[in-house]
């Protein structure tokens, strides 16, 4: 495997970004496939070299915006839209949006520079859990869409998957809607 190191100078005096030192990361299957070279060679040639990891939290080391105190903990958001969501399009469907760790350097760096709105402060949550906030947000996005689009009869919900995201989705759905009966169908009978 080839490892490349890239140095980038960041002027923190004229920045609207927060500088963060990652302290906990989670690695997902997509990041594993990049790291292990198990993606299509054409895809790898377009996206590498790149720092992996899109699930992480960290500690603020500098914030010229004054939003955070140095030492404050934040979860980092890998979705980088050119503008905020509106009533028509979610930010991840907007033209110009890109995702860190998918053709753009992810969070496996010594210091990360992110716009303030791509960070979420947290307290009283273990770092190991905060590092999974992006993963959990995928399930919450599905639940928000369900809440907006589903008809009002919600006695039963079927989840067609049995992986880790399906588990998080079922857990969050049960927490938010304890009266709903959830059925999970997958290909692994032991689950």
Which ranges hold each PLM region?
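Conserved hydrophobic/aromatic beta-strand scaffold that supports enzyme active sites
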Residues: 5-9, 57-59, 73, 111-113, ...
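Active-site-adjacent beta-strand anchor residues
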Residues: 21, 53, 61, 132, ...
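Glycine-rich Rossmann-fold phosphate-binding loop(s) that bind the pyrophosphate
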Residues: 135, 161-164
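Adenosine-nucleotide cofactor-binding segment
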Residues: 154-156, 160-162, 174-191
């Amino acid at each position: 495997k080839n490892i490349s190191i890239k140095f980038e100078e960041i002027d923190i005096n004229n920045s609207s970004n927060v500088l963060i030192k990652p302290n906990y990361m989670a690695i997902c299957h997509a990041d594993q496939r990049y790291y292990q070279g198990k993606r299509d060679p054409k895809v790898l040639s377009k996206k590498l070299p790149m720092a992996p990891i899109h699930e992480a939290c960290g500690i603020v080391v500098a914030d010229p915006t004054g939003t955070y105190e140095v030492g404050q903990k934040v979860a980092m958001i890998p979705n980088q839209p050119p503008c905020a969501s509106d009533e028509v399009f979610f930010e991840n469907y907007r033209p110009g949006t890109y995702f860190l760790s998918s053709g753009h350097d992810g969070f496996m760096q010594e210091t990360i520079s992110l716009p303030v709105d791509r960070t979420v402060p947290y307290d009283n949550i273990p770092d190991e859990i905060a590092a999974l906030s992006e993963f959990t947000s995928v399930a919450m996005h599905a639940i928000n869409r369900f809440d907006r689009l589903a008809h009002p009869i919600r006695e039963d919900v079927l989840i067609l998957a049995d992986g880790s995201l399906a588990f998080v989705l079922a857990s969050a759905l049960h927490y938010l809607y304890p009266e709903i009966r959830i059925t999970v169908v997958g290909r692994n009978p032991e689950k």
